[in-house]
UniProtKB/Swiss-Prot annotation:
Provenance organism: Chlamydia muridarum (strain MoPn / Nigg)
Xref: SUPFAM superfamilies: XseB-like
Alphabetical list of InterPro entries matching this protein: Exonuc_VII_S (IPR003761), Exonuc_VII_ssu_sf (IPR037004)
Keyword Hydrolase appears in the UniProt entry: yes
Protein name: Exodeoxyribonuclease 7 small subunit
UniProt keywords, alphabetically: Cytoplasm, Exonuclease, Hydrolase, Nuclease
Gene Ontology CC, one term: cytosol
Entry similarity comment: Belongs to the XseB family.
Enzyme class, spelled out: hydrolase
Length: 72
C-alpha cells in the first residue's frame, strides 16, 4: 500500500466526504486534465471504500446495541 493510501485510511469520515465533494467539483471543471481526472478518480475510489467500510462498522455497532437493548 502506498503512503498516500495509508494517509487516506486515517482520514475522518466527515473529512473524506468533504474531499469527495471537492473531487467531484474538480472533475466537473473543463480545465481539469485527463491525467489529473484519473488521479482524482483513484483518490475518490479509495475514499469511497473507506467511507463505506466505516458506515458498515457503524451499522453493525447500532445493530449490536439494538440487539442488546431488546434482550434486556
Amino acid at each position: 500500500m502506498t503512503k498516500k493510501a495509508k494517509n487516506v485510511e486515517k482520514v475522518p469520515f466527515e473529512d473524506a466526504m468533504k474531499r469527495l465533494e471537492e473531487i467531484i467539483d474538480l472533475m466537473n471543471q473543463p480545465t481539469t486534465a485527463l491525467e489529473a481526472s484519473l488521479a482524482l478518480y483513484e483518490e475518490a475510489d479509495q475514499l469511497m471504500r473507506i467511507c463505506e467500510s466505516r458506515i458498515q462498522e457503524v451499522e453493525a455497532r447500532i445493530k449490536q446495541l439494538s440487539d442488546q437493548r431488546s434482550e434486556s
